Amino acid sequence: MEDYTKAEILIEALPYICKFHDQKFLIKYGGHAMVNEQARSWIAKDLVLLKYVGINPIVVHGGGPEINRAMEKMGKKPEFIHGLRVTDEETLDIVKMVLIGKINGDIVSKLERYGGKAVGLSGKSGQLIKAKKKIQYLMKDSQKIEVDLGMVGEVEHVDTKLIDILVEKRYIPVISPIGVDHQGNDLNLNADIAAGDIAGAMDAKKLIMVTDVDGIMDDVNDQSTLHRRLTISQIEDMIEKGLITGGMIPKIEACINALDKGVQSVHIVNGKTPHAVLLEIFTEDGVGTMIVRE
């Protein structure tokens, strides 16, 4: 690559660096995007670079595949309803062990390896996430019935003070999605939905979902059907047509929730694409799907 071409690539990022300087970006780092060591390095480098050019990344991570593996090793079969993990007491212990005890620390170490300053948290830290037990309903024989997900929660309140302090001190907060109810009980939170709630509470400019798909497509096997930009109404139409199903539904709910709470745009990118976060933010075309209100 010629020097001029290298300079052109850098200059393309300048308007975006100026536009987003001192803004908060919530990065939801999905468990399926963590399975590749090279991909983990790309994401870590991207986040450290964001911090050094004056953008404030805040990370919420999942860990579904590792939780599933840990459960299977212990003889438990993972169970999901509408993309949400059914969580009994033993499952919750496994979830906390994997998320807080392993994945969170791994992400912090990776960020620090590439020159960043990072701090690992969970929703339990400093009463960060107050949650309540989630009530889930299903349609059966044209009737709405309540199903018990166990110790699964939904966010009631996010206390941003601790995150604000860390961001001001130039740290990258890395948050495990475990909440606490008013009786002090731990609750398992869907990482996508928690990320949307935290993004809204933090007045984040963007929510970026780093996962293992390129974005939202009409046909997951046909890259040419990738949507670069969608509105909420277009998303809802795709759900009605059955083009968005299963585990993607909580992601979309999180996206819409974040937009409803003031986040300006949500982006879904593939963590296995080299430096997907930088390419989505700092180039005109991006590499994933951007979702906006209208």
UniProtKB/Swiss-Prot annotation:
Signal peptide: none annotated. Substrate binds at G63, G64, R85, N188. GO terms for cellular component: cytoplasm. It is found in: Cytoplasm. The record marks K28, K251 as: Transition state stabilizer. Keywords: Amino-acid biosynthesis, Arginine biosynthesis, ATP-binding, Cytoplasm, Kinase, Nucleotide-binding, Transferase. It comes from the Archaea. GO terms for molecular function: acetylglutamate kinase activity; ATP binding. CDD domains: AAK_NAGK-C. GO terms for biological process: arginine biosynthetic process via ornithine; L-arginine biosynthetic process. Pathway: Amino-acid biosynthesis; L-arginine biosynthesis; N(2)-acetyl-L-ornithine from L-glutamate: step 2/4. It holds the Pfam family AA_kinase. Belongs to the acetylglutamate kinase family. ArgB subfamily. Catalyzes the ATP-dependent phosphorylation of N-acetyl-L-glutamate. This is Acetylglutamate kinase. It comes from Methanococcus maripaludis (strain C5 / ATCC BAA-1333). The gene is argB.
